Amino acid sequence: MTDTNWKQNLNLPPKDTRPQTEDVLNTKGKSFEDFNLKRELLMGIFEAGFEKPSPIQEESIPMALAGRDILARAKNGTGKTASFIIPCLQLVKPKLNKVQALILVPTRELALQTSQVVRTLGKHVGTQCMVTTGGTSLRDDIVRLHDPVHILVGTPGRVLDLAARKVVDLSECPLFVMDEADKMLSREFKGIIEQILEFFPPNRQALLFSATFPLAVKSFMDKHLTKPYEINLMDELTLKGISQFYAFVEEKQKLHCLNTLFSKLQINQSIIFCNSTNRVELLAKKITELGYSCYYSHAKMPQQARNKVFHEFRQGKVRNLVCSDLLTRGIDIQAVNVVINFDFPKTAETYLHRIGRSGRFGHLGLAINLMSWNDRYSLYKIEQELGTEIKPIPATIDKSLYVAENADAVPRPFRIDELPKGNETVHNKGYQYKGQPVKDENSGSSSQQQQQPPPQQQQQQSTSPPQQQPQQQQQQPNPQHQFAPHPNGQFPPYPQQFHQPGAIPPQQFNGYPPYPQYPPQFAGYPGQPPQLPQGQQQHAQAQNPAQQY
């Protein structure tokens, strides 16, 4: 391949022509070719859809290639991940069969996402990347480390375990990278990070990236970094493309308000945050009962289920995701344009990372906060700390604030064309519009029982030409506060008090994929539990707190 035509043979993705903000456009006019990168690395960068470096990439990549320690601070969704992955891929030597770069991240989902970016950008370089996290088989990680691994991505606990067992050798690893450094240096991880650094050589290079840097980062920098190059692109903390609104809602009316938002907003994909795992599962159940496709994810779920939820949501197989603060950091899903705080966060840091899941890489996004009257103090505190204004929600929200003017401008990977645009739910055989029965392929009949119309209407229907379903959908009126139809064809009752979940979930709620079965202790449900002798009932109730509800 000659020097002139190598770009012509690239498999470039569709160009993203959505409008972008100054967060990623305020650059010095450099290109990736100005960094003297390998041609194989440039091929992976361009084929991944990158056109020009963002401000944080312009500042950090040259200094990282020069061997300097870096302490970089930039907004969420401005390209921090590529800022440290590109130098790693450039400095790694594929012919040297040893770990040459360690990337530490706080969550398992972020580790999976980071490893995927490494493989995407470095697919022509020839480097081998491995991801290791807690909740997975340690034996499998040990077996995989017998093969060549150049870049290791993982969470601190598992990496420390592998290093302490001398399964992975970090004594000659020249690169140490921490993403979300403020979280990594909190009390939860700081001791583990200190132990991991003891396995590194004294002349290793350290790259630290985050959106917020507390005092703990300053003390770590003074101890472990050598004349670090500090980058601070935070002229303001919040992204310029995100519109922020709040609404004071009583607790028992929050679900009704959420249903109204679903019917009014043009949502491509949305993330809904709750403050506890119990409320995450309960809210996902309520949203499913309203007729909307929904998954949920939190830290107490099995790792296999968390991975399945994360990948299917990234692929656009579901429109809404209810989660705890597990997915507040680093998760980059370009199709998400709406973030809803069903429970208002207590700290400015949590709020900043939550709303940063929308408006990725300078695009438009919308953040809506459902607040109780007691949250007004937290609202004032967050506004003061972030230096931003959260406005009261208007009667109608202008679509130009969070939706691209031209729908065709959104690249195919970021479009959810396979999902219905209105109210939908998940059936065993795929997505179906409300009112359309799910056809049974074996019997040829519908799974929903429909009433037969009178003979005169049947004759009129047989003589009239068939109409397409989208035209019928447009002819139906759309009242302002109309509920989403229930999967059984009926409308749900007015939302009741938002209470804690019972021991047994409703049978129509499938939960997160893979859909779990009833717990073993409730194997007899539905029905009555086995009767115990009177002397053992009190002891059994104490052993199973779930039956106290």
Swiss-Prot record:
DEAD box (motif): residue ranges: 179-182
Top-level lineage group: Eukaryota
GO BP terms: cellular response to glucose starvation; cellular response to nitrogen starvation; deadenylation-dependent decapping of nuclear-transcribed mRNA; invasive filamentous growth; mRNA processing; mRNA transport; negative regulation of translation; negative regulation of translational elongation
Motif extent (Q motif): 30-58
Residues noted as binding ATP in the record, renumbered to the chain: A74, K75, N76, G77, T78, G79, K80, T81
Catalytic activity field: ATP + H2O = ADP + phosphate + H(+)
Entry GO MF terms: ATP binding; ATP hydrolysis activity; chromatin binding; mRNA binding; RNA helicase activity
A GO CC term assigned to this protein in UniProt: P-body
EC number per UniProt: 3.6.4.13
Name of the top EC class for this enzyme: hydrolase
Region (Disordered): 1-24, 414-549
InterPro entries in UniProt: DEAD/DEAH_box_helicase_dom, Helicase_ATP-bd, Helicase_C-like, P-loop_NTPase, RNA-helicase_DEAD-box_CS, RNA_helicase_DEAD_Q_motif
Biased composition (Polar residues): 1-11
Residue ranges constituting the Helicase C-terminal domain according to the UniProt record: 241-401
Keyword annotations of the record: ATP-binding, Cytoplasm, Helicase, Hydrolase, mRNA processing, mRNA transport, Nucleotide-binding, RNA-binding, Translation regulation, Transport
Bias (Low complexity): 445-482, 496-512, 533-549
Domains: entry comment: The Q motif is unique to and characteristic of the DEAD box family of RNA helicases and controls ATP binding and hydrolysis.
Purpose of the protein: ATP-dependent RNA helicase involved in mRNA turnover, and more specifically in mRNA decapping. Is involved in G1/S DNA-damage checkpoint recovery, probably through the regulation of the translational status of a subset of mRNAs. May also have a role in translation and mRNA nuclear export.
Family: Belongs to the DEAD box helicase family. DDX6/DHH1 subfamily.
Protein name: ATP-dependent RNA helicase DHH1
Protein's organism: Candida albicans (strain SC5314 / ATCC MYA-2876) (Yeast)
